[in-house]
Amino acid sequence: MPEKILVVDDDPDILDAITMILESQGYQVVTARDGVEGLANLKAEKPDLMILDLLMPKMDGWAVCKELQDPRWSKYRSIPILILTSVREEASRRRYELETGLELDVDDYLEKPMAPNTLLDRVGKLLKKREKV
């Protein structure tokens, strides 16, 4: 059975591009347009990995990560999280995002736009790491 990846991003073009890249490698992809929908899909779909944008309406990526630290979500803690952020941010903002992401137990960090091979490499590493746990 193919590994399932939940992609949460409010930009439909990013969602389509990431879905196409991942599906081309045989992954099953589930999408969500905001953090609220992302958490609902996390419960319903039980993915092997979550790719999560930081800046979204309703509930952003930080709020999702904070919510996942609540004991009610403990059975989902083994699911790796790959954070996406915009490369257009200034360096100090990116550093803040990275440090905050590490505090929130995020597994990896990738700037948009990303090369397909970079995305696939990071996804592969996170899924392998999860298998070892």
Pin down the residues of each PLM region.
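Receiver (REC) domain active-site loop signature in two-component systems and cognate sites
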Residues: 56
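Active-site beta3 strand of CheY-like receiver
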Residues: 45-51
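Helix N-cap/capping motif at the beta->alpha junctions
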Residues: 31-40, 61
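Alpha4 helix (beta4-alpha4-beta5 surface) of REC/receiver domains from two-component response regulators
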Residues: 63, 77, 88-110, 117, ...
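Short amphipathic alpha-helix used as the core "switch/output" element in two-component signaling
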Residues: 40, 62-75
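Charged docking surfaces used in two-component/phosphorelay signaling
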Residues: 16-24
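The C-terminal output helix
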Residues: 121-133
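Active-site residues of response regulator receiver
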Residues: 9, 53, 85
